Amino acid sequence: MTKATDEGTVIAVQANYYWVRLRNVTSQPLLCTRRTRLKKVGQKVMVGDQVRVELPPSLLLHGRSNTAPVPMVAEGDLGAIAKVYPRRTVLERPPVANAEQICLVFALTDPPLEEWQLSRFLVQAEATGLEISLCFNKQDLVQETDVKFWGDRLAAWGYAPIIISVENRWGVEKLQEKLRSRISLMAGPSGVGKSSLINLLVPGVEQQVKNVSGKLRKGRHTTRHVELFDLPHGGLLADTPGFNQPDLAVEPAQLIHLFPEARQQLTGQECFFKDCLHRGEPDCAVGQDWERYEHYLTFLEEVLAQQNPENSRETDTGLKTKTGSDGQEYDEPKLETKKYRRHSRRQEHQELQSFCEQTDLDNLQEDWE
């Protein structure tokens, strides 16, 4: 007997279960497992994947129309992902498939806008190969001269930031137009208003929003998983866990191409040395007369150190190197790993409860198969 199927988009992943937004079921997402044959061939399922789902028997599909009743998913019903369609793009951190653009959100103040942190996020976003939309929030808390200063400065970097205020909804329409009919990834440091912005862009979504820490003036991390949200005017938006220092997982020779202002200088001309790393070598096409040159040198040293960990100070001295908000490096001792720490009773109870809940879902899966 041929099983009823439908196609859809994976909007969330929880352990070995997947929430899928089906094309013909609009009332709620369907909780699914992954077919055993996909596991055997090592086929992973990611947020953003386009998939074919085998539907549970109790789920009846209706055609899309204004008069047809909205199909409902009975509580406890599980679908099964039978096929994952080829991906157009893949990101590992965060794990998202088929994303088309990255929307970087920063605050003009509270927390203060740090140029080194901003530059680092931009470089890592460039490394994904996706289109970048840069958004500056909290316009209502700064002077117009500050807005112009950062707008002109970012133009020299090769970007045209969208200035908004979530508080008074100023400029949000322009951002909505950029997100329309696309799968977009929202990222940025903590405390800049990403969760509040998603609440505004996606009416009804319940994102936890916490106040910015007054002591350190750094945002508390509020989002802990990747999830896709339906935008009212079409498109999907993924929020990602907040982080303050994204990794620079790039090759040294590739790094210079992640700076638009330097990339433009390399258009139509080449350096004298093919392995030039643009650190003052003779006849270098990039040169040193651009604002983020010091950023480039600092990031380059970090990338080179990652390729030669045996030569790093962390291995030899027990120190770890950190980069401050001004871009300067400093050392601090590494903490000893707690190898023999016992699990608390509370943690053991939580693990047992999680095991029991998963066992129930597995029984449902066996009944369905």
Curated annotation (Swiss-Prot):
Principal location class: cytoplasm
InterPro entries noted in UniProt: G_CP_dom (IPR030378), NA-bd_OB-fold (IPR012340), P-loop_NTPase (IPR027417), Ribosome_biogen_GTPase_RsgA (IPR004881), RsgA_GTPase_dom (IPR010914)
Keyword Amino-acid biosynthesis attributed: no
Residues reported in the UniProt entry to bind Zn(2+): C271, C276, H278, C284
Location of region: Disordered: 307-369
Residues of the CP-type G domain: 88-246
Name recorded for this polypeptide: Small ribosomal subunit biogenesis GTPase RsgA
